[in-house]
């Protein structure tokens, strides 16, 4: 039977019962009295308030313990009556208060018992109990026989502390005592209740918060058989003593004590055996183990607050704040700020060289490609069809696949897909990224998409991969994805701020390194040269040298070339701005080979150059003067002879002691040039401003005659009319001496400058200095131009081409000279009997040249044509591929060589040209037809016409088709059925390719 204890009853109900019985004897019991009354009415009243509740112990099989908030004891009244010598105690239970009933089998009369006690002392003399003790003892034995089954179930008292429910018989059965009164019931139950006196609990029900049930699984009451005179007082022993042991204990908030305590389990017999001891009282049970254990709690004190309060809150003893900041996935600055947080960095991972932060809350990840923080981006990951977020496992798996294949995807997108998509969209190519990429694990495909429409972005709809997407290559991510690794931030750089950089400032005057630059040339120069006539800005690394000299206006010789078009000669800021290659030229005085600039040997603006002595043909890198040195000397000279702002005089150079050719020649031969001084015939006298050029560093100044202002005798070239397309300049005479004055049968400095200007316009095409990728490969170098001008007075036309031209005789105004032609010599009449793949094929050697062709054949298209940034430069490679892949009859004979697409793609990567984007695999519609074009002796001009047609056709294919026809074999372009003889020579191949591509354009476009 379950005993319940509660401290929450506002009231305890009153139970009233009446009995009728025969009259009997009367007697006394200690200080209490027992009386027997016929037809007496016994009223049991238990008053309980919020501060007091009823506590009772019943000997008929149940024990009820109630702890109250007050030390006062309730009043219990018990009246007994009986007419039979044999009585049976029965238990009748109600929900609130139940009275014990004794029924006589002889008279079928019943009596109810109740007890009251107001004293802590329970008398131990039970001998005076009534004469019917024998019968009483029998009944008591019957009652006592159940004592072994009585369990206090003390755990219920501690477990959850449910409300106190007095559902047991509070009153003991005292059979046969007719005269006993309520005083006789001052035994065990009352003693147990009285034992609570003095105990104080502020809120004992709180103790149930964390306590497991206290289970007393032993017999609380021992069998006391044979004690005829024992009454209910005999039950006032162990339980009362155990309860009394709690006296004096004080708990301000008992639930605190339960916070960390394990359940108290009293599995021992609380009460000792008191067999046969009629006079034993509750004192005999005061030495039990359970009582001792309970007594040990006396004096304990617990505070009201939980012991672990504030552990997870802020404070010196709390845990650190591990929360992550928020970020805006659309703002790169916000992403960098977020990733710089130490808690975020500790959660970042590395995969395939990329830094990753996986945000499981958003089903996204932040990617830092290849550790480049400038390219940080946030990528949302969802189900491609349902558009739902992924769980953590799938998110990590797909993130690993994306990182593993990102490098492969980037290369495929940048080189192949993006140019095609940009061309279709009509936007500039470069820098465009797909909006969405779907990685399909089922079909093992990866498709990139542009912006989705509302239907495609809706749930339950997968965008078409073939109509709307573009397949991209992610590599072998479906076989094996790379694992995530932790990042060692001790060796990896984190996101840097915009103001990143350490500044070192010298705070001590006079200390530290000297301000003058080191005389040692820099190994990696960066030169930006802006040449204006009379005022040139030379930017060498971080050193700017500006010189603009102004002289009084003087009368000078009228030049034949207008200077209005000789402004703003600008070479870009590259180390190879004037880096040209001329392996075939061995003429004297030229600056040949690869010209690599180095910084000036001194930081002053004297214009001096430092170089060891070498012969006139010494090239840079072999103890020869650097092009920077030559330009510096030229600049100093021009500042003198063309004084004033923005190029100075428009009437030609002022007479000086030397010419521009002398300056260049001296620098090339001796490593330095003498000072340029205006000649005395200007009328300005010795006070005219002059410019001095020192020989070497700190070398002595060289002063020459002011009357020497002629052009050096090594200035030569053919003469031409002023301003014509040949780049030549008029000269009065083809014969000149070094000391010939300007305007006196020699080319003027303006003529030389005009020729230089025209050359630079070709090798640096475009506005304001043109190409930023360095000079284009041409048929001659800048040194050749100056040498020819100094030698013959004219120079040949500069042609951007990978080959050199031939020499021929050209007449000038004052005679004739040997110069190079404008274009390469026309090829001999093509022969239909000469195999175009043979060594004697003139067209092949002409188009490719020996070294370039050999390089392309050896490397499979890896040979680079320097400066070949236009589509025309792709034709030699295509030609070389045709020579290798097709025989004389036009049949495909070699499949081992690289595809045409790979050659074109490599060309694009090298030159930055969009060119043809990929090889052709299949084309819609008819492939077109071709007709054989036979070449005759009069078809020389068709070579360039065919090349121009092929160029235009290829450009149209690149712009319109743009990979819509991917992967078609080259044989299908030049041969419809694989039979026939096509492409016998250059004319046939060019014409047929042009016609086929035109047919494709008509079919597709």
From Swiss-Prot:
Top-level lineage group? Bacteria
Q: From the UniProt record, list the coiled-coil ranges.
A: none
Reply yes or no: does the keyword Secreted apply.
Answer: yes
Modification(s) after translation = Phosphorylated on a tyrosine on attachment to the host cell. Tyrosine phosphorylation is temporally and spatially associated with recruitment of actin to the site of chlamydial entry. Phosphorylated Tarp seems to remain cytoplasmically exposed on the inclusion membrane at one side of internalized elementary bodies for several hours after entry.
Q: Where is the composition biased (Polar residues)?
A: 1-10, 130-154
Locations listed in the record: Secreted
Looking at the UniProt record for this protein, which Gene Ontology cellular component terms does it annotate, in alphabetical order? extracellular region
Q: Which UniProt keywords apply?
A: Phosphoprotein, Secreted, Virulence
* Start-end of Low complexity biased regions: 11-36, 73-121, 542-578, 593-612, 720-736, 831-846
Does the record's keyword annotation contain Zinc? no
State the Gene Ontology terms under molecular function: SH2 domain binding
Listed PANTHER family:
PTHR36975, TRANSLOCATED ACTIN-RECRUITING PHOSPHOPROTEIN (PTHR36975:SF5)
What does this protein do, in the record's words?
A: Appears to initiate or participate in signaling events that regulate the actin recruitment, which ultimately leads to internalization.
The entry assigns this protein to a family as follows: Belongs to the chlamydial CPn_0572/CT_456/TC_0741 family.
Protein name as it appears in the record: Translocated actin-recruiting phosphoprotein
Could you tell me which species this protein originates from?
A: Chlamydia trachomatis serovar D (strain ATCC VR-885 / DSM 19411 / UW-3/Cx)
**Gene behind the chain:** tarP
């Amino acid at each position: 039977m379950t005993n319940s204890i509660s401290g929450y009853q506002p009231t305890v109900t009153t139970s009233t019962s009446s009995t009728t019985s025969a009259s009997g004897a009367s007697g006394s019991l200690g200080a209490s009295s027992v009386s027997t009354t016929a037809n007496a009415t016994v009223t049991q009243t238990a008053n309980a308030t919020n501060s007091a509740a009823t506590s009772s112990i019943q000997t008929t099989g149940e024990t009820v313990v109630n702890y109250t908030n007050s030390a006062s004891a309730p009043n219990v009244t018990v009246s007994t009556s009986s007419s039979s010598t044999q009585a049976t105690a029965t238990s009748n239970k109600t929900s609130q208060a139940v009275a014990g009933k004794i029924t006589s089998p002889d008279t079928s009369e019943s009596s109810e018992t109740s007890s009251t006690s107001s004293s802590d002392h329970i008398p131990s003399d039970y001998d005076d109990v009534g004469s019917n003790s024998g019968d009483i003892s029998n009944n008591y034995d019957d009652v006592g026989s159940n004592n072994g089954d009585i369990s206090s179930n003390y755990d219920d008292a501690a477990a959850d502390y449910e409300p106190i429910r007095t559902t047991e018989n509070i009153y003991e059965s005292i059979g046969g005592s007719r005269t006993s009164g309520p005083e006789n019931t001052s035994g065990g139950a009352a003693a147990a209740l009285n034992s609570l006196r003095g105990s104080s609990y502020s809120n004992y029900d709180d103790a149930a918060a964390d306590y497991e049930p206290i289970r007393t699984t032993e017999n609380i009451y021992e069998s006391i058989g044979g004690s005829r005179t024992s009454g209910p007082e005999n039950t006032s022993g162990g339980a009362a003593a155990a309860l009394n042991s709690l006296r004096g204990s004080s708990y301000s908030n008992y639930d605190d004590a339960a916070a960390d305590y394990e359940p108290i389990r009293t599995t021992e017999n609380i009460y000792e055996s008191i067999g046969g001891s009629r006079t034993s009282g509750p004192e005999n049970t005061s030495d039990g183990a359970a009582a001792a254990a309970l007594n040990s709690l006396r004096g304990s004190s617990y505070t009201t607050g939980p012991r672990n309060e504030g552990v997870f809150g802020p404070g010196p003893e709390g845990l650190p704040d591990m929360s992550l900041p928020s970020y805006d996935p659309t703002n790169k600055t916000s992403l960098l700020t977020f990733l710089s947080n130490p808690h975020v960095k500790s959660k970042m991972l590395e995969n395939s060289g990329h830094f990753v932060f996986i945000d499981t809350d958003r089903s996204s990840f932040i990617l830092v490609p290849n550790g480049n923080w400038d390219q940080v981006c946030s990528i949302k990951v969802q189900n491609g069809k349902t558009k739902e977020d992924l769980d953590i496992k799938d998110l990590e798996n797909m993130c690993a696949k994306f990182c593993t294949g990102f490098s492969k995807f980037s290369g495929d997108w940048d080189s192949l897909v993006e140019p095609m998509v940009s061309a279709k969209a009509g936007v500039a190519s470069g820098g465009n990224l797909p909006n969405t990429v779907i990685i399909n694990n089922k079909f093992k495909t990866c498709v990139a998409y542009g912006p989705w429409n509302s239907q495609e972005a809706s749930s339950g709809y997968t965008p078409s991969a073939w109509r709307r997407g573009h397949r991209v290559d992610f590599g072998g991510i479906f076989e094996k994805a790379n694992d995530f690794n932790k990042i060692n931030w001790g060796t990896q750089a984190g996101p840097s701020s915009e103001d990143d950089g350490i500044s070192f400032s010298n705070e001590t005057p006079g200390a530290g390194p000297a301000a003058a630059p080191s005389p040692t040339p820099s190994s990696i120069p960066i030169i930006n040269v802006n040449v204006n006539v009379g005022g040139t800005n030379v930017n060498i690394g971080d050193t700017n040298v500006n010189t603009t000299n102004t002289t009084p206006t003087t009368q000078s010789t009228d030049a034949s070339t207008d200077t209005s078009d000789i402004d703003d000669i600008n070479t870009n800021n590259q180390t190879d701005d004037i880096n040209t290659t001329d392996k075939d030229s061995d003429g004297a005085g030229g600056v040949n080979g690869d010209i690599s600039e180095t910084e000036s040997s001194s930081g002053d603006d004297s214009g001096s150059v430092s170089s060891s002595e070498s012969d006139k043909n010494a090239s840079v890198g072999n103890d020869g003067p650097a092009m920077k040195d030559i330009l510096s000397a030229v600049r100093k000279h021009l500042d003198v002879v063309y004084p004033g702002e923005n190029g100075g005089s428009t009437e030609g150079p002022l007479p000086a002691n030397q010419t521009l050719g002398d300056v260049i020649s001296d620098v090339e031969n001796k490593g330095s040039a003498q000072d340029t001084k205006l000649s005395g015939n200007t009328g300005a006298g010795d006070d005219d401003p002059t410019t001095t050029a020192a020989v070497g560093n700190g070398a002595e100044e060289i002063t020459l005659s002011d009357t020497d202002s002629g052009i050096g005798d090594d200035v030569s070239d053919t003469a031409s009319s002023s301003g014509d397309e040949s780049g030549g300049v008029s000269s009065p005479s083809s014969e000149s001496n070094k000391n010939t004055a300007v305007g006196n049968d020699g080319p003027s400095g303006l003529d030389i400058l005009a020729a230089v200007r025209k050359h630079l316009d070709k090798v640096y095409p475009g506005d304001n200095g043109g190409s930023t990728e360095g000079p284009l490969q041409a048929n001659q170098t800048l040194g050749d131009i100056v040498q020819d001008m100094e030698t013959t007075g004219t120079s040949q036309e500069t042609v951007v081409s990978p080959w050199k031209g031939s020499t021929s005789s050209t007449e000038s105004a004052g005679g004739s000279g040997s110069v190079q032609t404008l274009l390469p010599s026309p090829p001999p009449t093509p022969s239909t009997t000469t195999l175009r793949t043979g060594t004697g094929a003139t067209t092949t050697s002409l188009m490719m040249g020996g070294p370039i062709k050999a390089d392309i054949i050896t490397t499979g298209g890896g040979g680079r044509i320097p400066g070949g940034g236009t589509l025309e430069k792709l034709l030699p490679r295509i030609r070389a591929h045709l020579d290798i892949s097709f025989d004389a009859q036009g049949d495909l004979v070699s499949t081992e060589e690289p595809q045409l697409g790979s050659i074109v793609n490599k060309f694009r990567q090298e030159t930055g040209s969009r060119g043809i984007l990929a090889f052709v695999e299949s084309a819609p519609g008819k492939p077109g037809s071709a007709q054989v074009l036979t070449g005759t002796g009069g078809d020389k001009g068709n070579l360039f016409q065919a090349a121009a047609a092929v160029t235009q056709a290829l450009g149209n294919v690149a712009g319109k088709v743009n990979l819509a026809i991917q992967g078609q074999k080259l044989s299908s372009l030049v041969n419809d059925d694989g039979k026939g003889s096509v492409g016998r020579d250059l004319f046939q191949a060019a014409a047929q390719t042009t016609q086929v591509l035109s047919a494709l354009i008509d079919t597709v476009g």
